[in-house]
UniProtKB/Swiss-Prot annotation:
InterPro entries: Calycin (IPR012674), Fatty_acid-bd (IPR000463), ILBP (IPR031259). Plays a role in lipoprotein-mediated cholesterol uptake in hepatocytes. Binds cholesterol. Binds free fatty acids and their coenzyme A derivatives, bilirubin, and some other small molecules in the cytoplasm. May be involved in intracellular lipid transport. The gene is Fabp1. Deamidation and transpeptidation at the beta carboxyl of Asn-105 forms an isoaspartyl residue found in an isoform of the DE-III fraction. This rearrangement gives rise to an extra negative charge carried by the acid form. The keyword Lipid metabolism does not apply. This is Fatty acid-binding protein, liver. GO terms for cellular component: apical cortex; cytoplasm; cytosol; nucleus; peroxisomal matrix; protein-containing complex. Belongs to the calycin superfamily. Fatty-acid binding protein (FABP) family. One of its GO terms (biological process) is positive regulation of fatty acid beta-oxidation. It is found in: Cytoplasm. Keywords: Acetylation, Cytoplasm, Isopeptide bond, Lipid-binding, Phosphoprotein, Transport. Forms a beta-barrel structure that accommodates hydrophobic ligands in its interior. The lineage of its organism: Eukaryota, Metazoa, Chordata, Craniata, Vertebrata. The modification N-acetylmethionine is found at M1. (9Z)-octadecenoate 2 binds at S39, R122. It comes from Rattus norvegicus (Rat).
């Protein structure tokens, strides 16, 4: 399955508590909670380029599925991680105690991130 395309956030749950737990400052949490971010994915074989735009903040990540890479987090921190496929429609990674599962289903992406007992869920639609 190829996931290439542009997707815009439609809804999110537990944004504020999750971002607080990640250490994001309160002013940035308040600015970011209502922004409908856009993710652009270029998926070619095992290579993935991901550009996420939240207002003026842009995060670029490139990785090869199944290989260690450096990812930039929402806080701007760079972390080492391995992004793996589960089945043919889920990308899964773990970094700094956070498990991230990104599920592709037609024109919808559901990203679920878990940190301790806080679960942040973001649903995006293809635009």
């Amino acid at each position: 399955m190829n996931f290439s395309g542009k997707y815009q956030v439609q809804s999110q749950e537990n944004f504020e508590p999750f971002m607080k737990a990640m250490g994001l400052p309160e002013d940035l949490i308040q600015k970011g909670k209502d922004i409908k971010g856009v993710s652009e994915i270029v998926h070619e074989g095992k290579k993935v380029k991901l550009t996420i735009t939240y207002g003026s903040k842009v995060i670029h990540n490139e990785f090869t599925l199944g290989e260690e890479c450096e990812l930039e987090t929402m806080t701007g921190e760079k972390v080492k991680a391995v992004v793996k496929m589960e089945g043919d429609n889920k990308m899964v990674t773990t970094f700094k105690g956070i498990k991230s599962v990104t599920e592709f289903n037609g024109d919808t992406i559901t990203n679920t991130m878990t940190l301790g007992d806080i679960v942040y869920k973001r649903v995006s639609k293809r635009i």
